[in-house]
UniProtKB/Swiss-Prot annotation:
Gene source species: Campylobacter curvus (strain 525.92)
Binding site for a divalent metal cation: 218, 220, 252
Pfam families the UniProt entry points to: IspD, YgbB
Enzyme Commission number(s) from the entry: 2.7.7.60, 4.6.1.12
Taxonomy, superkingdom: Bacteria
Protein name: Bifunctional enzyme IspD/IspF
HAMAP family: IspDF (MF_01520), IspF (MF_00107)
Cofactors named for this entry: a divalent metal cation
InterPro entries for this protein: IspD, IspD/F, IspD/TarI, MECDP_synthase, MECDP_synthase_CS, MECDP_synthase_sf, Nucleotide-diphossugar_trans
Chain positions of site Transition state stabilizer: 16, 23, 244, 343
Gene Ontology biological process terms in this record: isopentenyl diphosphate biosynthetic process, methylerythritol 4-phosphate pathway; terpenoid biosynthetic process
Binding site for 4-CDP-2-C-methyl-D-erythritol 2-phosphate: 218-220, 244-245, 266-268, 271-275, 342-345, 349, 352
Length: 371
């Protein structure tokens, strides 16, 4: 049995994918795509190490703590070099998280090919006529290269010690004189690049219908000389709320609820009050940025409920406008947002009129990429 480690490349920004969710975070059942693709390959072989390359290592590690995670670079090649620093096995298998349907048949051909060369690469032939400029190319000489690719680790590390950028491992291996062996690829190993590719991937199943609830709470004291903002609405009052941002305590609680439902920490981690960039900033902008983050990892908001606790000022007449502000910022129907107001019956700092407290809940579901 060969000594092999697996590297899964998934640090791209999905710029060509054209959906609010990054492709690596599309849910296949309950698993994000990167995890589904990694599990698929790990069912075929007992790898020495499984290394996932990402820009979100800490968050990913919560899904698979038994894997190793490494931060990706600006290019595929730099990402691979970063991962290779953790590899000590004789061979390394490199694949993309965007190829979730690798078959056991293809995997076996790649492993068997290790007897033939230093690098084994799946490749497809083309059936269509091909041109380069105005010249017809002999299509029998054209190969469409796929992953996973199996290489001798020491040679691949050597091959990548260059400023020349390569788009796959075999190109780098050829450049240092390593032998390369092609095995017949598989159409089912198609790579997801744009959203139209999803229809070409046979093994994908729709996201599960699980829902996730988050709770957020925040409280601020009144401060004279500041504007009072609640749910993106300016309220005429003699006091505002003391804060680093605009002090919109309701949006802070809602932002925490949304982040919490996705397991993405809290508003203070994303927008620390020690950062001058966020001094006086609109909390609607912070909410939008937080929601983009939540969307990027595969969630969408179903509904949110906000309870504002204030002895004064009276805000009942502003509730519908507040709901519309939030719905507009998040591109949702207003009926998905509910704002309530209450007092604390003269109890506590709220009852004494010293400030405002808010509790919010948010309900998320997986983004449905099948629509």
């Amino acid at each position: 049995m060969l000594d092999i480690s697996l590297i899964m490349l998934g640090a791209g920004n999905s710029s060509r994918f054209e959906l609010p969710v990054k492709k690596q975070w599309l849910r296949i059942g309950s698993d994000p795509l990167w995890l589904a693709a990694t599990k698929n390959l790990s069912e075929f072989y007992t790898f020495k190490d499984i290394i996932v390359v990402s820009k979100e290592c800490e968050y990913m590690a919560r899904f698979a703590p038994h894997y190793k995670f490494v931060t990706g670079g600006d290019t595929r090649q730099q990402s691979l070099k970063n991962a290779l620093n953790l590899v000590s096995s004789q061979f390394v298998l490199v694949s993309d998280i965007a190829r979730p349907c690798i078959t056991h048949e293809l995997f076996s051909k790649i492993i068997e090919g290790s007897k033939q060369a230093n690098c084994v690469v799946p490749a497809l032939k083309i059936a269509d006529t091909a041109y380069f400029g105005d010249e017809v190319i002999d299509r029998d000489k054209i190969k469409l290269i796929q992953t996973p690719q199996l290489s001798k680790t020491n040679l691949l590390k050597q091959a990548l010690e260059t400023d020349t950028l390569y788009t796959d491992d075999s190109s780098a291996m050829r450049a240092v004189g390593a032998s390369v062996w092609h095995v017949l690829g598989d159409e089912r190993a198609h790579k997801i690049t744009t959203k139209s590719d999803l229809a070409k991937i046979p093994c994908l199943i729709p996201p599960s219908n699980e829902h996730f609830t988050g709770i957020g709470f925040d409280a601020h004291e009144f401060e004279r000389g500041r504007e009072l903002w609640l749910c993106g609405e300016k309220i005429e009052y003699e006091f505002g709320l003391k804060a680093h941002s605009d002090g919109d305590v309701a949006l802070h609680a809602l932002t925490d609820a949304i982040l919490g439902a996705a397991g993405l920490g809290d508003i203070g981690e994303l927008f620390p009050d020690t950062d001058a960039e966020f001094k006086g900033i609109s909390s609607l902008l912070l909410l939008q940025e937080a929601y983009k983050k939540v969307q990027s990892v595969g969630f969408e908001l179903v509904n949110a409920d906000i309870t504002i606790m204030a002895e004064r000022p009276k805000i009942s007449k502003f509730k519908r406008k507040m709901e519309a502000n939030i719905a507009g910022a998040l591109n949702l129907a207003p009926n998905r947002i509910n704002v309530k107001a209450t007092t604390t019956e003269k109890l506590g700092f709220v009852g004494r009129g010293e400030g405002i407290a808010v509790i919010a809940s948010a309900n998320l579901k997986y983004y449905d990429w099948t629509k």
